[in-house]
Amino acid sequence: FKRDMSELWVSSEIGGTVSIIDPAKRTVTGKINFNIPGLRREAIQPVGMGITKDGKTAFVALGPANRVAVVDATTHAVTKYLLVGQRVWQMAFTPDEKYLLVTNGVSNDVSVIDVAAQKVIKTIQVGELPWGITFAEP
């Protein structure tokens, strides 16, 4: 959900899209498609997502595409793709929302994204096949 509960975002891994749903009307109001030059459509599989607290920017993990899509959460337009590790899956914002950490299951690491700059700043090696990640609120 967006923080104001106006939209529910649902990823469709096999369908390759994110559906935008109006929870009050229980209808799909839009779909976000992802197109990365040089990659087959079936390699682009949206899975984990996160939306900033201000509701302006969304990040979508694209699985075997090894990318995180940056999406304008107001217009639903994809603004850029960030190259991360192999098989990006889940993500979590740090409590101060300065960073977004994403798990890369096949490369056994976590990519650190600077949220304001919208760029990958670090890769941290972790245990084998990481999939989930979370932070406790302070």
Protein language model annotation of sequence segments:
Residues F1-P138:
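Predominantly soluble domains enriched in secretory-pathway, periplasmic, or organellar proteins
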